[in-house]
Amino acid sequence: MSRGLFASLYEAGRPFALIDTRERRDHVDGHWFGSTNIPLSVLTAGITRMVPDRDFPVHLLDWRDPASNAAAQRLSQLGYASVAHCPTSHPGGFGEGFVKGEYVWSKAFGEVLAHRCGLPEVTPSEYLQHHRDALLFDVRPTAEYRQFTIPGSQSLPNSLLLANMEALKASGRTALLHCAGRTRSIIGACTLKAAGYDGPFAIFKGGTQAWQLDGHDREHQAGRVFAGDTDNPAATRAFLDKWRIPFDRVEAGDIGPFVEAHRGRLLFDVSDDAARGRPMEHGILKLSGTNLIQQTDQAVARYHVPVVLFDHGSGSRAAFAAYWLRAMGFSVQVALLGGRLDEAPAPDAGQIETPFPVLAADELAAHWKHERPVLDFRSSAAFRAASLTGSSWLNVSACLSGSPPPEPAVIIANDIPHGVGTADLLAAHGWQVAGIFPWSSATQLEPAGIVPGDPGIAIDESALFAGRHYGNMQDSRDYLAWEEELPGQIDEPILAQWHRLLAS
């Protein structure tokens, strides 16, 4: 068992990563707080992105199953030289560091924050009866706002609050901040409080889920965007000075030397709130500043490693994220850029060596016509969107618990590196691999042969509270209750640290 492992590693104060390589569904159903989920099915891409230094101390949770053994072997093949194997198991209940759900680090932190700040909350019925003159603001990224929101709400992501405080105040009306549940609205309201905003504001309690639970319909495809940015960083610099967050001004020609001077740190470009983890030049990862705070344990695998946040324009996105990362216990600084970063060049697939044949479209068709197994190892979401007629969806972790098929199989993968990694895992388990077809070459296939797929029960997707945004009211009730209970289930030393930092 691993009770207390994360807390002991964290309290030691030395850099470390605690990795759980089970598939997403199993991890969400129960995991050790502080562990980062990098599933075996995407381990190669995930670990090299989140822990690029092959000498970095990695603590691998060993669930004593074939998939855990395969993960250990894969890390060794990738050159990770400092891997500690940590035997573990499900303790049979939740609490004392064993939790369920996703983004638990951020959600538990948000609940601690809510209890400390004591900010006003407005329920849906109170809004309709007494606060219809207030302005509703959805503080999620705009793309999520467009999917669904509360009728009449405007898009104002958390990471742009600092850049829009004057516009908020100029409205002369109460700002009601909401998200889909609780965490991001709590963070947003507390951001305004920390910034010294003196206009009226409150939290719309329970967000869109509470709105639905009260029997109201959501609005879809809304387009009212309140958020704006400015090229003037003066106001943001005032917040950085007030909060004592170190920052540098970095011009376009100086980015390379700046990154080299900060090599080994966590480098995030938070300048685009729609970003979802795009690799940028110099090894910088581009992601949403709003979601970096709401999904911290999906972005950060290396603890006790300083964070550098890159931003341009007003810099409000970096200032927002820096303030809350520091409150969570991270060492953080900001780099205000004179221009935008370029995306990293795509890897040259032609240089990848593989012992497995890489099939062209006609070769794949020949295998299919002879009724040989054609197995798709992409994500279930990708398979559901488009698949080869007659192919079957599989997940590599599930495959390792069973017997290999009697005849050679064709593997469909995202690309050649993904295919090679998957084929290596299967071959080590006794599979015969006839070849790899990278779905990046799917444009060569006959369009009539590509159809939506049915992956069945997909272990790479979470089933916990899965219906909360699709009309399942019980899932919504359970989800909101789960969020509020989280602080009592995480490791006590982390909880104590958050209280200490928030009190300072």
Where are these regions (language model features)?
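Rhodanese-like catalytic fold shared by cysteine-dependent sulfurtransferases
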Residues: 1-17, 21-135, 139-266, 270-373, ...
